[in-house]
C-alpha cells in the first residue's frame, strides 16, 4: 500500500538575512486532517518558516511542496490561492474598520465588481463570528479588547477556503472558555480533512490537541514524533537543548517576609469597570492577580498608575497619598506598569534598545540646554541590559530585532530606569517560550528580593501558583477573595474567578481601619 502524499511538505529549506541564518536545511511535513504542533524557543525559526509557507518571505534554498508538487509561494495572495492560511500571533487587523470588513478584506480584494453588498457581508461575518464569540461584527476593531481582537483574527482565517491553517500562539490572549471553543473548532476542521499547524509554548494544549510534534532549535530541525510517544519534559528538553530544572524560583522564605506595606489600595473604583477594590502589597512580595479576562484586572492596574481616571477610593505609597492623574506622575512617584500589549504600548519597536530604556526618564539624561547626554544614556542602557541578561547585538540595535523574551526584558529595563518602588505587570510572559519564561520569573524574584513590590496579573494559573506569594482573585470588578499558602490551588482560584464563594475582601479590609 502506497504511503499518502503530504498535503504540505518543506524540504531542506534555508533562509538567510545577510550573514544571519534564520533557518538551516529544515524539513517538515503535514498530513491531510492532521493537527501538527511546531515547537521551539523564540528565535528557533518557527515564525520564519510560517512566513515562508504564507508567502511573506521567500526561502534562500530548498523547496515547498503542496500535494507532492513543488510550488513558488511568492506572496500571501499566492498562498491563499493554494489554500494556505495563517492566523498571526501579533494582531494584524485594521482598527478603524469594522469586524466584518476585517474578516472579509481578503475576499473583497479579489472581487471584480466595484459594488459591495454590506448587508450580506455582515450577515455572513456574524455567522462565522458566532462560532467563536457573540461579538457584533458592526463594531470597530479598535474598540475591542485584545482577546476579542484575537478572536476576530481567528474568525478571519475561517472565512478563507483553506486546506492548511497555521495557528501561531492562538490562545495567548484567550480565556479558558474561549480556548475550549477554539479547540472544538480545530477538531471540527480536522474532521473535515483540513490540516492544522499549531504553534504553541503551552504543553497542555499540544498534548490534548495535536497528533505529531516537530521541534526546531536555533534555526534547525531537531525531531518529529507522535505526541503519544513523548512527554512534555521530552519536548521541553528538545526545545532548549538543556534541562530546565525549575521553572519557578523559590518563593519568599518566612525569614524574608515583612509586614511593611509598600502600596495600599482602599475602596478604589472608576464608576464602571471596577469598584470597592481593597488590597495591600508588602515590600519584596510578588502578589498575583487572577480572574477571567474582562473581570477588571487590567483596569484596576491602570487606575492605580494614572492611566485610567478613578472616582472613588485612594492609593497610598509608603503611607503617603498617591494622586497620579497621569502615568508620568505615577512613574515619577515610583509606581510603574508593564502593559499586556507589549508591542502596542510597552516598547517602541523601531527605536533602539538604549532609546527605549531612556524614554521614561529623559529629564535626568538632558543637560541645561536640553541636549541629550548620549554617554549617560548608553551607560544606563549597558548597566540595565547587563543586569537583566538581555541577549542582543548591541544597545543601538532596534528592539524589533530581539526575540519576544528579550523584548520583554527591555520593557522591564525601561521601567527600572526610574528606580521604581512598585511594578505592576500585566501578562508578563505572554507569547514567550519556556526558557525565556523561566528567566523572567527569576528576574522578577530577584527584583522582589531587592525590595521592590511586584503585582503580576496573569491568566496562566500555573504561573500564579508557581511564582506568586499570594493571589488576589477579581470577579466582576472587585476582589472576590485571596488565597495563599496551602489554599493556593487552581480550583480555589477558578471558583473565586467564576463568582463561587461570593465577594470577600476580609483580608484586605483588616488593614482598612
Curated annotation (Swiss-Prot):
The EC number(s) given in the record are: 7.5.2.7
**Where is the major localization of this protein?**
membrane
Bilayer-crossing regions: none
Q: Which domain of life is it from?
A: Bacteria
Q: Name one Pfam family in it.
A: ABC_tran
Instruction: Identify its membrane topology class.
Output: Peripheral membrane protein
Is Cell division there in the keyword field?
A: no
Subcellular location per UniProt equals: Cell inner membrane
Where in this chain does the record put each ABC transporter domain?
8-243, 256-501
Tell me the GO molecular function terms.
Answer: ABC-type D-ribose transporter activity; ATP binding; ATP hydrolysis activity
Functional note? Part of the ABC transporter complex RbsABC involved in ribose import. Responsible for energy coupling to the transport system.
Protein name, entry field: Ribose import ATP-binding protein RbsA 3
Q: Which UniProt keywords apply?
A: ATP-binding, Cell inner membrane, Cell membrane, Membrane, Nucleotide-binding, Plasmid, Repeat, Sugar transport, Translocase, Transport
Gene source species: Rhizobium johnstonii (strain DSM 114642 / LMG 32736 / 3841) (Rhizobium leguminosarum bv. viciae)
Amino acid at each position: 500500500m502506497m504511503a499518502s502524499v503530504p498535503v504540505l511538505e518543506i524540504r531542506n529549506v534555508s533562509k538567510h538575512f545577510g550573514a544571519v541564518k534564520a533557518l538551516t536545511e529544515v524539513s517538515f511535513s503535514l498530513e491531510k486532517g492532521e493537527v501538527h504542533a511546531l515547537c521551539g524557543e523564540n528565535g528557533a525559526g518557527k515564525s520564519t518558516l510560517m512566513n515562508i509557507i504564507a508567502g511573506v518571505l521567500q526561502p534562500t534554498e530548498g523547496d515547498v511542496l503542496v500535494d507532492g508538487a513543488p510550488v513558488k509561494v511568492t506572496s500571501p495572495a499566492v498562498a491563499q490561492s493554494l489554500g494556505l492560511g495563517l492566523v498571526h500571533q501579533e494582531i494584524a487587523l485594521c482598527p478603524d474598520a469594522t469586524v466584518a470588513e476585517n474578516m472579509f478584506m481578503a475576499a473583497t480584494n479579489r472581487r471584480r465588481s466595484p459594488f459591495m453588498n454590506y448587508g450580506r457581508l455582515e450577515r455572513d461575518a456574524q455567522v462565522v463570528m458566532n462560532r467563536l464569540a457573540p461579538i457584533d461584527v458592526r463594531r470597530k476593531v479598535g474598540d475591542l479588547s485584545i482577546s476579542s481582537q484575537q478572536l476576530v483574527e481567528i474568525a478571519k482565517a475561517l472565512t478563507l477556503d483553506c486546506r492548511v491553517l497555521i495557528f501561531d500562539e492562538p490562545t495567548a490572549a484567550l480565556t479558558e472558555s474561549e480556548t475550549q471553543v477554539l479547540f472544538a473548532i480545530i477538531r471540527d476542521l480536522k474532521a473535515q480533512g483540513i490540516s492544522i499547524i499549531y504553534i504553541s509554548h503551552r504543553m497542555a494544549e499540544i498534548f490534548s490537541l495535536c497528533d505529531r510534534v516537530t521541534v526546531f532549535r536555533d534555526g534547525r530541525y531537531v525531531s518529529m514524533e507522535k505526541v503519544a510517544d513523548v512527554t512534555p519534559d521530552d519536548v521541553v528538553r528538545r526545545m532548549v537543548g538543556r534541562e530546565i530544572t525549575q521553572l519557578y524560583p523559590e518563593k519568599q522564605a518566612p525569614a524574608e517576609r515583612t509586614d511593611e506595606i509598600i502600596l495600599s489600595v482602599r475602596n478604589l473604583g472608576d464608576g464602571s469597570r471596577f469598584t470597592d477594590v481593597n488590597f495591600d502589597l508588602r515590600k519584596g512580595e510578588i502578589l498575583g492577580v487572577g480572574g477571567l479576562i474582562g473581570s477588571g484586572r487590567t483596569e484596576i492596574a491602570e487606575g492605580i498608575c494614572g492611566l485610567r481616571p478613578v472616582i472613588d477610593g485612594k492609593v497610598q505609597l509608603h503611607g503617603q497619598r498617591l494622586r497620579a492623574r497621569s502615568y508620568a506622575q505615577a512613574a515619577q512617584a515610583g509606581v510603574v506598569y508593564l502593559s499586556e500589549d507589549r508591542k502596542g504600548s510597552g516598547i517602541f519597536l523601531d527605536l533602539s534598545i538604549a532609546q527605549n530604556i531612556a524614554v521614561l526618564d529623559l529629564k535626568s539624561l538632558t543637560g541645561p540646554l536640553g541636549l541629550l547626554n548620549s554617554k549617560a544614556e548608553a551607560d544606563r542602557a549597558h548597566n540595565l541590559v547587563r543586569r537583566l541578561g538581555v541577549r542582543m547585538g548591541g544597545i543601538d540595535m532596534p528592539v524589533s530585532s530581539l526575540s519576544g523574551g528579550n523584548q520583554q526584558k527591555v520593557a522591564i529595563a525601561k521601567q527600572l530606569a526610574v528606580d521604581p518602588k512598585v511594578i505592576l505587570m500585566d501578562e508578563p510572559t505572554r507569547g514567550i517560550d519556556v526558557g525565556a519564561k523561566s528567566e523572567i520569573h527569576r528576574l522578577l524574584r530577584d527584583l522582589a528580593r531587592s525590595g521592590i513590590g511586584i503585582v503580576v496579573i496573569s491568566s496562566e494559573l500555573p504561573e500564579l501558583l508557581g511564582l506568586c506569594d499570594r493571589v488576589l482573585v477579581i470577579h466582576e470588578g472587585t476582589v472576590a477573595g485571596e488565597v495563599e499558602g496551602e489554599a493556593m490551588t487552581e480550583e480555589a482560584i477558578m471558583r473565586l474567578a467564576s463568582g463561587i464563594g461570593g465577594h470577600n475582601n476580609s483580608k484586605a479590609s483588616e488593614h482598612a481601619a
